[in-house]
Design a protein with these regions (language model features):
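C-terminal structural segments of small proteins and small subunits
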Residues: 69-95
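Short S/T/G/P-rich N-terminal loop/turn motif that feeds into the first structured element of a domain
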Residues: 1-59, 63, 67-74, 100-104
């Protein structure tokens, strides 16, 4: 069975280092450790990776790999996930979500 990779790229309204680090901290607080998570990572764009193919129009990246589609679907309605959205959405200029079936 394929795992589901949930990748989210946030562009902030206020793109200061303090705000980007605050969003990374919120990702770690609210989005890590959900049932069915096999990988979690959150961080900021790498400043010196600027080849022509690099997309750099985001501030914070979130990657969560779930063991199944069912685990992903449960995460979407989990209270901690919804609280993360409620608390952080006011500073989002854009959010892009990429979901993919993946396997090793």
């Amino acid at each position: 069975m394929a795992q589901l990779a949930h990748m989210v790229y946030f562009t902030l309204k206020d793109r200061t280092p303090a705000n980007t680090e605050a969003l990374v901290a919120a990702c770690r607080k609210y989005l890590n450790g959900h049932p069915g998570t096999v990988y979690f990572g959150a961080g900021t764009v790498v400043p010196d990776l600027d080849r022509p193919v690099n997309v750099r129009d985001f501030d914070v990246a979130l990657q969560v790999v779930f063991e199944s589609r069912a685990a992903h679907d449960a995460y979407q309605t989990a209270p901690r996930h919804l609280q993360f959205i409620e608390e952080n959405k006011p500073n989002w200029a854009q959010v892009r979500v990429f979901d993919a079936d993946v396997s090793a």
